[in-house]
A protein has these predicted regions:
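N-terminal, polar/charged subdomain of small-to-medium soluble alpha/beta proteins
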Residues: 1-78, 90-137
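Short hinge/gating elements
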Residues: 78-85
Length: 137
């Protein structure tokens, strides 16, 4: 990813250059174990440069974390998504902040969106490469 930014009410609140834009959907049954699995996978995932030789740490990349409950949508029945599998907002915000704190331990540049806000998120994707990580499978 070449760059990403988050705007709220047409004002940029965070932006990064080369690195990862990570959308996080928090499910009702996510735990601290899921946080650790997610963190370890992302920090060590070798997806950068030729032949995918380097991790985000290796390239001293930047990370933009954005909470997105719509990733928890269930579309199996009907034509309207159900979000019943998403964690309730008050608890999800605590989990999201814990995830942010965990990533800050990496000493990489970490930026975030604003939890619960209506955001304009833009991305200049390279490849494109988009990977979905699920700590339950």
């Amino acid at each position: 990813m070449d760059s990403a930014k988050v705007k709220i009410s047409n004002k940029t609140i965070s932006s990064i250059n080369s690195g990862l834009l990570i959308f996080i959907g928090i499910y009702f049954n996510d735990t601290s174990d899921d946080i650790n699995k997610l963190y370890n996978k992302i920090i060590n995932l070798r997806i950068f440069e030729e032949n995918n030789k380097f991790s985000i740490r290796d390239i001293a990349g930047e990370i933009l974390l954005v909470s997105q409950f719509t990733l928890c949508a269930n579309t199996k029945k009907g034509n309207r998504p159900s979000f019943k599998d998403a964690m309730e907002p008050e608890k999800a915000e605590i989990i999201f902040n814990t995830i942010v704190d965990k990533f800050k331990e990496s000493k990489l540049k970490i930026q975030t969106g604003q939890f619960g806000a209506f955001m304009d998120v833009s991305l200049k994707n390279k490849g494109p490469m988009t990977i979905m990580l699920d700590t339950k499978i």
